[in-house]
């Protein structure tokens, strides 16, 4: 990966954070195990594949995914599977083969039956790949956001990628909940999904489709945070490292250390395969996932979005899914105003901004001491104004939000 990201973040080594305080862990693909489902397909197994497609979102979702993942990775040739495994091991991942399900029970609930009915010999592989890329989004999207994506965007996006049949993928809430329950960080089936995604990324003929429909839409990889930093820094006309210094208040230093480490690793990646190996290590490694915790950096994300929101209301779409208290939301608006004022009017050499931010924090703390702490809210906005999101049903409460 040349230019862009590497040049923008080359100065992060100079950020004034105590290096003895501990930084984010280096992401090592070799510490992450990927799963590859294997099992021979005969000439009469076409019905098994179609039944598996129809069964997505039903009681046998995991079994169905194992059949579909086995099909897209190996087709009807064991040699193809071995070649795909080599791609993953060359990226540095550990790869374990696991037997796929042998079939789907007849008469079982088939939520994706309408999609399966669009299949023929010519489009089977493309439809299955498109469905799997869509399912991969549930590693990050909430159930409600996924339903919105399917109903409003998937059909058009599928058409642009030559898979218009995806408009028939069901947005039934029960089916999406079932899929969401299977495709979560740390799950075996999720590691198999991303084994497939990574092999598609390695193929130049399918890279653009994956980037449009799958992996790059997952901001849980940390790339959203890098994008927010880049956008905010560009708007302010300053290097990302200088902006990061301003944001390193005591309460945010730990998150900042992790961000620095992630940015350094991504900026030093020399190929798209290496970059995605780093990103997927974060998504798929259970220990990494716990140490990074998707919402650890939500406060910084919120501030960055508010900064860019001063320049373009559309930038506030980056706040979608980030949970903060009303008190902190007000605080981020003040911080954004101070930073914009610093770089547009006060001047880049000013040292006043940190004192202003600290005093603002003290004022908010004093105000908060006189009233109960407000409950954290999930702000979603496409108009630049925060709106409280209703809490999802109890069995989806623990699903991660959309912040890094």
From Swiss-Prot:
Keywords: Capsid protein, Helical capsid protein, Host cytoplasm, Phosphoprotein, Ribonucleoprotein, RNA-binding, Viral nucleoprotein, Virion. The keyword Phosphoprotein applies. GO terms for cellular component: helical viral capsid; host cell cytoplasm; ribonucleoprotein complex; viral nucleocapsid. Disulfide bonds: none annotated. It comes from the Viruses. Residues 391-404 have a biased composition (Acidic residues). The keyword DNA damage does not apply. Residues 357-404 are annotated as: Disordered. Pfam families: Rhabdo_ncap_2 (PF03216). Its main location: virion. GO terms for molecular function: RNA binding. It is found in: Virion; Host cytoplasm. Residues 357-376 have a biased composition (Basic and acidic residues). Belongs to the novirhabdovirus nucleocapsid protein family. Encapsidates the genome, protecting it from nucleases. If expressed without protein P it binds non-specifically RNA and therefore can bind it's own mRNA. Interaction with protein P abolishes any non-specific RNA binding, and prevents phosphorylation. The soluble N-P complex encapsidates specifically the genomic RNA, with protein N protecting the genome like a pearl necklace. The encapsidated genomic RNA is termed the nucleocapsid (NC) and serves as template for viral transcription and replication. Protein N binds protein P in the NC through a different interaction, and can be phosphorylated. Homomultimerizes to form the nucleocapsid. Binds to viral genomic RNA. This is Nucleoprotein. It comes from Viral hemorrhagic septicemia virus (strain Makah) (VHSV).
């Amino acid at each position: 990966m040349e230019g862009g990201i590497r040049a923008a973040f080359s100065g992060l080594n100079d950020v004034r954070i105590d290096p003895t305080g501990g930084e984010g862990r280096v992401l090592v693909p070799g510490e992450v195990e990927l799963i590859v489902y294997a099992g021979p397909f005969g000439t009469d197994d076409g019905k098994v594949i179609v039944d598996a497609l129809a069964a997505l979102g039903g009681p046998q979702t995991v079994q169905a995914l194992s059949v579909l993942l086995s099909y897209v990775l190996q087709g009807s040739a064991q040699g193809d599977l071995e070649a795909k495994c080599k791609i993953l091991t060359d990226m540095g991942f550990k790869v374990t083969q696991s037997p796929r399900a042998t079939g789907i029970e007849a008469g079982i609930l088939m939520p994706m039956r309408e999609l399966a009915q669009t299949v023929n010999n010519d489009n089977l592989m493309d439809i299955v790949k498109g469905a799997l890329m869509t399912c991969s989004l549930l590693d990050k999207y909430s159930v409600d956001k996924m339903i919105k994506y399917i109903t409003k965007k998937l059909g058009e996006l599928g058409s642009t990628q030559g898979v218009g049949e995806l408009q028939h993928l069901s947005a039934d809430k029960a089916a999406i909940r079932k899929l969401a329950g299977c495709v979560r960080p740390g799950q075996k089936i999720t590691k198999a999904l991303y084994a497939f995604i990574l092999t598609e990324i390695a193929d130049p003929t399918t890279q653009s489709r994956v980037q449009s429909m799958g992996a790059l839409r997952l901001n849980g990889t940390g790339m959203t945070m890098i994008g927010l930093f880049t956008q905010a820094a560009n708007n302010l006309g300053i290097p990302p490292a200088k902006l990061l210094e301003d944001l390193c208040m005591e309460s945010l230093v730990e998150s900042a250390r992790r961000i620095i480490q992630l940015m350094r690793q991504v900026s030093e990646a020399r190929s798209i395969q290496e970059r995605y190996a780093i990103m997927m290590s974060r998504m798929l490694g259970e220990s990494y996932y716990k140490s990074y915790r998707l919402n650890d950096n939500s406060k910084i994300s919120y501030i960055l979005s508010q900064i860019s929101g001063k320049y373009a209301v559309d930038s506030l779409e980056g706040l979608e899914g980030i949970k903060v208290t009303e008190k902190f939301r007000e605080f981020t608006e003040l911080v954004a105003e101070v930073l914009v004022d610093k770089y547009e009017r006060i001047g880049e050499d000013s040292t006043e901004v940190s004192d202003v931010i600290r005093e603002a924090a003290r004022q908010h703390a004093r105000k908060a001491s006189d009233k109960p702490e407000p409950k954290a809210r999930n702000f979603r906005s496409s108009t630049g104004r925060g709106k409280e999101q209703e809490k999802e049903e109890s069995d989806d409460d623990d699903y991660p939000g959309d912040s890094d």
